[in-house]
A protein has these predicted regions:
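Inter-lobe coupling/hinge segments of SF2-like helicase ATPases
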Residues: 80-82, 111, 119-346
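Upstream accessory/linker segments immediately N-terminal to the RecA-like ATPase cores of bacterial MutS
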Residues: 1-105
Length: 346
């Protein structure tokens, strides 16, 4: 109740029972707590200094992470890595056994990866291409090239399902070659995991596939030479660079259909090398992309076209604070569309 007038507001309760009412017109100033799952946040006192102290510590930590990243990338540019041999006859056999014809971009990317691996400077290359355009085949070829020089390969993926999918794909492609592929995840028994780790440490496993479990303290490679990161946009900075720090002269191959801005910026600035796979495989239509200003008529026409062919639309907006406003605009433009909102703080 504000001067006798009822007004909708959000009630915030602080430590000690202090209460603060936030007008619905100021909802953009607050957001839902986002932290570790199951973690109970500590409540601060209204007017206290603890929250400001926490923010200052967080800013300081972010600056330190950024500094460490700059140091890491600078060091990788000057450090001496492992120079791989030129292709063996087995490498040629593997590539010849690929059941599809390489696209022009696959050919160029394969050449670029091999040239990187044969240099003394550690490779750090981003392969950017849509789903189904052949990024995994490039990873298989790079992995086998490393194995051919008695190096081990770590493949970091974001989900257990993808780890199993890659395990089956790699095992099937390399079944006729001297290469041991294995995986590690939470569905393996403790005994099975321990055996996998033992074999890895003894060099009996050439390629290990897994989620962030493979960067655990108990995971020790005998001679890690190549790290492949798939769908890197789903990993945090610390997870990816923790494994890079494990061995600074390891070659890095990153695969992504939608690289995060930081990764793309590093590639555009030259801190990382970039290969783009634009050419679709035979019988696959290339994705059509247009960059235009926000235009309601264009948006309406595009959505209506998809609905008319029983398709679905994924509309991405970059701010949670007014994402519902955008949903309202879309609903106004296309009243017959069923629209739902989802974001990371739900």
């Amino acid at each position: 109740n504000n001067n006798g007038k009822k007004q909708e507001s959000i009630k915030l309760i602080y430590k000690g029972g202090d209460i603060l009412y936030i007008s619905i017109h100021s909802l953009h100033k607050i957001s839902k707590f986002s932290g570790k799952e199951g973690h109970q946040p500590s409540i601060n006192q209204l007017g206290g200094t603890r929250w400001q102290t926490t923010k200052n510590k967080t800013k300081s930590r972010i600056k330190q992470i950024a500094y460490n990243l700059i140091q890491l990338y600078a060091k990788r540019k000057t450090i001496k890595g492992f120079s791989y041999s030129t292709d063996t006859y087995l490498q040629h056999e593997l590539e010849a056994s690929f059941m599809w014809e390489d696209t022009p971009d696959q050919i160029l990317s394969t050449i670029a990866i091999k040239e990187d691996m044969e240099k003394e400077t550690p490779m750090d290359r981003l392969i950017c291409g849509d789903v189904g355009f052949g990024k995994t085949e490039l990873a298989i070829r790079a992995a086998f090239k490393a194995v051919a020089d008695n190096k081990q390969v770590a493949i970091l993926v974001p989900t257990t399902i993808l780890a199993l999918q890659h395990y089956k794909t790699f095992r099937n492609r390399l079944k006729n070659f001297p290469c041991k592929v294995d995986y590690i995840n939470r569905f393996k028994t403790t005994k099975q995991q321990n055996q996998t780790l033992k074999d890895l440490n003894e060099g009996k496993i050439d390629i290990l596939i897994g989620t962030h479990r493979i960067i655990g303290k108990d995971v020790n490679f005998k001679d890690l030479g190549l790290l492949i990161i798939d769908e890197e946009q789903k990993f945090g900075v610390n997870i990816k660079d923790k494994l890079k720090n494990y061995k600074k002269n390891v070659d890095i191959l990153t695969l992504s259909a939608t690289p995060i801005p930081r990764t793309l910026q590093f590639s555009l600035l030259g801190a990382r090398d970039l290969s783009i796979i634009n050419t679709p495989p035979p019988n696959r239509i290339a994705i059509h992309t247009e960059i235009i200003g926000f235009n309601e008529e264009t948006i309406r026409d595009a959505i209506q076209y998809e609905i008319s062919r029983n398709g679905q639309i994924f509309f991405i907006h970059n701010r949670i604070e007014n994402i519902k406003e955008i949903a309202g605009i879309l609903q106004r433009l296309v009243p017959n569309a069923k629209i739902k909102v989802g974001h990371g703080q739900m």
